[in-house]
Amino acid sequence: FIVSMILLYAASTVYHTFDISEHVNKILRKIDHMMIFILIAGTYTPVCLIVLGNKSGYRMLSLVWGIAIVGIIINALWINCPKWFSSVIYIAMGWVCIMAIRQIVAALTPAAFTWLLAGGIIYTIGGVIYALKLPIFNSKHKNFGSHEIFHLFVMGGSACHFVVMYSLL
């Protein structure tokens, strides 16, 4: 989980910090978007192996990492993949856990489950904001819009899931 979080935030920081050339920026954006798949799968890994820890956990882990690999390939090959399409995949991938919700609820403490659910909801709201480019601000707010709001939700979701992972130690 931590490795996937570091990879995502490192890729995002590099992409959002440096403006080298249009070609390099396009590559960095692709890597940034690919790392979202890695973070989602990285978040699932301890849930599947520690919380579920059975055949359904291994199946879910295989499914999620399979989706991550396919998503990475799609992002690598589809040059102008629409934001809404990527967002739908990210959100759907994030909610695959619904298939084992009873087991997850039974295995986690109520507090850990609440943090897990809160993180998922926060990420989902951020994904919807990103996909729909909401809210639409007037020209007064040129440097703060849906993309920046999305990143605030991503940090909130990451913080919630960090609490869950810490509780599993």
Regions found by a protein language model. Give the residues of each.
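Multi-pass alpha-helical transmembrane bundles in non-GPCR membrane proteins
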Residues: 1-169
